[in-house]
Amino acid sequence: MAFTLGGRARRLVSATSVHQNGCLHKLQQIGSDRFQLGEAKAIRLLPRRTNMVQELGIREEFMDLNRETETSYDFLDEMRHRFLKFKRQKYLPEIEKFKALAIAQSPKVMVIGCADSRVCPSYVLGFQPGEAFTIRNVANLVTPVQNGPTETNSALEFAVTTLQVENIIVMGHSNCGGIAALMSHQNHQGQHSSLVERWVMNGKAAKLRTQLASSHLSFDEQCRNCEKESIKDSVMNLITYSWIRDRVKRGEVKIHGCYYNLSDCSLEKWRLSSDKTNYGFYISDREIWS
């Protein structure tokens, strides 16, 4: 038996179909729009994606470099370990001493040392924090007052006139690269001389004396002699500063020269003496500590 719909039913079905078809069409349109928007966005993102890929490539290379560095020597981790060890083993057990040092310093010694990493004055001579005011430069040179201001003589002025140190030590050492540069440098100063060459030429007088006295020796032996002569010259140059010379005359400041031999861990020492009659100064009292 055939089943037929009434007029009202046909109208409802027809309306429903139209509604469904309209919804379907709208959904299709929305999907198409979204696809077009997505496509446009993707096109806009292409350069950004390319940059990201390039950046990732750079990051990968950087990470590879980091991995190589970390496997060889992780500097920051090592420094962190050493600092915390210092705090745990030295700072905390003597915290009152370090709190006092945080307020002020009153060192009795001024050291002019070489910048060489193998020769730390505090390590070699056993100075504790607050005991020695230290300045280091290439070849531990002290220039005379007429040469003008340097970081070394400015530190000297502060140590002597403000901190009122009682001893000044010029500390040199064997196998000094600065003195080797001085000895190997030609006696004329070229226009393109490096900063190191120009600085070490402040020791030229010691070089010339060494060449005159030991020209028959090997280059290395001449360097050893020049290292000591340079220390003596720096000691004498200290007297060109009136605020040092006057204190030495009054016995308030003593000046010493030290030569540390890296090969056998010996220390050769001199002292600056003065002639009371005419206020002349000379190097004396040579000692060797070994």
From Swiss-Prot:
MF terms (GO), sorted A to Z: carbonate dehydratase activity; zinc ion binding
Gene Ontology terms describing biological process: carbon utilization
Key words, A-Z: Lyase, Mitochondrion, Phosphoprotein, S-nitrosylation, Transit peptide, Zinc
Alphabetized SMART domains for the sequence: Pro_CA
Enzyme Commission number, as recorded: 4.2.1.1
Localization annotation: Mitochondrion
Top-rank taxon: Eukaryota
S-nitrosocysteine found at: 226
Tissue expression: Strongly expressed in aerial tissues including leaves, stems, flowers and siliques, and, to a lower extent, in roots. Accumulates in guard cells.
Transit peptide: 1-20
Keyword rRNA-binding part of the UniProt annotation: no
Annotated Pfam families: Pro_CA
Catalytic activity: hydrogencarbonate + H(+) = CO2 + H2O
Broad EC category: lyase
CDD domains attached to this UniProt entry: beta_CA_cladeB
One Gene Ontology cellular component: mitochondrion
InterPro entries named among the record's database cross-references: Beta_CA_cladeB, Carbonic_anhydrase, Carbonic_anhydrase_CS, Carbonic_anhydrase_sf
Subcellular location, principal: mitochondrion
Residues carrying Phosphoserine: 122
Keyword Methyltransferase carried by entry: no
Protein family according to the UniProt entry: Belongs to the beta-class carbonic anhydrase family.
Function: Reversible hydration of carbon dioxide.
Name the record gives this protein: Beta carbonic anhydrase 6, mitochondrial
